[in-house]
Amino acid sequence: MSDSNPGAANPALGPDADAAAGEGLELAQFAAGCFWSVELTYQRLPGVARTEVGYSQGHRHEPTYRDVCGGGTGHAEVVRVHYDPKACPYEVLLDVFWAKHNPTTLNRQGNDVGTQYRSGIYYYTAEQEKAARDSLAEKQKEWKERIVTEILPATRFYPAEEYHQRYLEKGGQSAKKSCNDPIRCYG
């Protein structure tokens, strides 16, 4: 195994090499607790063309929800966002990320506990990395507690089971752009 390519022996550790879902679109990955409400928040954002929920940053190839919830895969529940940077700059995605969750609770959001619920920004480019680190430094000034958000290169993305995709929208909550209805998470 080459040190420069950890994904050579384990595909889960390699970079997310998927292409965005359209010309002019870019990808971003965020972990902010249960992916259902995070996904709906990004679905409503003008400039976001597509969202997907799934698993990233772990070591098991092709994990399932059950595997991830078992805690042994190292994966986080993430939302992968396909966005138009001209209509929705990456910094706007970061603002939504910080507003959506408590970045000071380690491996927990509300009643959801486990490493899969950790806070993370997973970048695709050096520009995204810089913006993420700069935004974390600014947000830390607003919190008394230490922010525990990890900022790492985006590793391979594994889509969650179809059941989880657009879960809250399929349950009747609006995904219309700019919708401000409260998001209710339920399972």
From Swiss-Prot:
Catalytic reaction list: L-methionyl-[protein] + [thioredoxin]-disulfide + H2O = L-methionyl-(S)-S-oxide-[protein] + [thioredoxin]-dithiol; [thioredoxin]-disulfide + L-methionine + H2O = L-methionine (S)-S-oxide + [thioredoxin]-dithiol
Keywords: Cytoplasm, Oxidoreductase
Signal peptide range in chain numbering: none
Protein name: Peptide methionine sulfoxide reductase A2-1
Transmembrane segments: none
Chief localization: cytoplasm
A Gene Ontology BP annotation from the UniProt entry: cellular response to oxidative stress
Enzyme class label: oxidoreductase
Pfam families in the record: PMSR (PF01625)
EC code: 1.8.4.11
InterPro entries per the UniProt record, alphabetical: Met_Sox_Rdtase_MsrA_dom, Met_Sox_Rdtase_MsrA_sf, MsrA_MetSO_reductase
Subcellular location: Cytoplasm, Cytosol
GO cellular component: cytoplasm; cytosol
Keyword Transmembrane helix: no
Role noted for this protein: Catalyzes the reduction of methionine sulfoxide (MetSO) to methionine in proteins. Plays a protective role against oxidative stress by restoring activity to proteins that have been inactivated by methionine oxidation. MSRA family specifically reduces the MetSO S-enantiomer.
